[in-house]
């Protein structure tokens, strides 16, 4: 049923440190739900969330990124079980220098079974990390629970985030159109023309998916 599927491969959501708002925690649940229901993967970046136990000055205590990570995992599990299509993917990202990084790395797979975890890293973050953090990260990678993602910036110095496959870096709510042009039905003499027309169609489509 292609009419109900999204014409994109993956997308990115950077969660702001607020329950409400267009890019807040609650908005991210809706965003992730829509992506998973319609077959797109989504990379959820949680580094802006306050660490576990942090006070906001209004009598509220933060529960931390890992606690919210469990909601995304449960959301993915329920949607996969209830939907006809079961091809959504959800990856949680956290910067290496976030105060809750060790908890993020060492949380048992049984507590986050329906999401992948990825640590955003660069040379500076690695050099500044404690030995405990480095050891936990290396063990997490060896166990298959943790993936690595390089932090990157666009030409204007604005940070862009890795999507699910880590091949494309996007701003928050950006979409990746990792598609293909099938030229199997073309004659050899029509391959060039078919490729150009196919790419033009994909470019037109991509502008409608943001």
List the model feature ranges, each with a label:
Residues 1-210:
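Extended catalytic cores of very large enzyme megasubunits
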């Amino acid at each position: 049923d292609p009419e109900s599927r999204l014409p994109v491969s993956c997308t990115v959501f950077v969660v702001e440190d607020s329950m409400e708002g267009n890019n807040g925690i609650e908005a991210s649940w809706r965003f992730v739900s829509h992506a998973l229901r319609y077959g797109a993967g989504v990379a959820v970046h949680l580094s802006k969330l306050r660490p576990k136990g942090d006070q906001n000055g209004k009598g509220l205590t933060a529960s931390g990124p890992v606690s919210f990570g469990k909601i995304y995992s449960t959301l993915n599990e329920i949607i996969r079980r209830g939907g006809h299509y079961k091809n959504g993917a959800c990856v949680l990202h956290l910067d290496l220098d976030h105060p809750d990084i060790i908890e993020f790395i060492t949380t048992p797979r049984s507590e986050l079974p329906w999401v992948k975890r990825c640590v955003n890293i660069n040379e500076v973050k690695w050099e500044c990390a404690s030995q405990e953090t480095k050891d936990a990260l290396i063990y997490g990678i060896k166990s298959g629970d943790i993936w690595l993602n390089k932090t990157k910036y666009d030409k204007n110095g604005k940070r862009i985030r890795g999507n699910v496959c880590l091949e494309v870096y996007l701003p928050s709510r950006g979409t990746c159109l990792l598609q293909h042009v099938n030229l199997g039905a073309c004659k050899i003499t029509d391959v060039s023309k078919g490729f150009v027309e196919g790419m033009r169609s994909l470019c037109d489509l991509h502008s409608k998916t943001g």
